[in-house]
């Protein structure tokens, strides 16, 4: 496969979800108009917020929207409700799957493989789970995946819990899975930090998709 150009953004500050979601949509629209435009990768952290997929069940929110003290967004992705917050590393991929494989199941499995390699770089053993999307350590979920796709151009991506307040997941039924336990990477490797994880995420995505990155 020939190398493909991708713009990559890796902000050090905590980013507002809605700003980054709008940015993804702009890059998706640009690729739909002209597939010679670059793909786009964003790696960073969000303020505390909750997002729901297209067909999400609001019963999986364990708080009243009218009294919510945090932002809640319904967005163009599959899957149920999840939580974003500082200490969790989020990666968004706006890719033209026509350059890779026009198969969403292949793409989901590819993302799971990428996450497993990322955690493996820190000597953390993890696995996918039949019948579910995401990555697990034993019976605890450490990474969530949610993607949207329009004309084979993807948006959204995956989140990995590094060192975040897992109590925030208690306000929802994570990914619609009853009694779902969550985990942080720091619980399995005390020596890592989010900047080092970010570096490994960039490296593995570059290798897996044969990207030439342009930093912004």
Swiss-Prot record:
Its EC number is 2.3.1.181. The keyword Transferase applies. The active site is at residue 175. The record marks 141 as: Lowers pKa of active site Cys. InterPro entries: aa-tRNA-synth_II/BPL/LPL (IPR045864), BPL_LPL_catalytic (IPR004143), Octanoyltransferase (IPR000544), Octanoyltransferase_CS (IPR020605). Pathway: Protein modification; protein lipoylation via endogenous pathway; protein N(6)-(lipoyl)lysine from octanoyl-[acyl-carrier-protein]: step 1/2. GO terms for cellular component: cytoplasm. It is found in: Cytoplasm. One of its GO terms (biological process) is protein modification process. Its main location: cytoplasm. Belongs to the LipB family. NCBIfam families: lipB. This is Octanoyltransferase. It comes from Prochlorococcus marinus (strain AS9601). The gene is lipB.
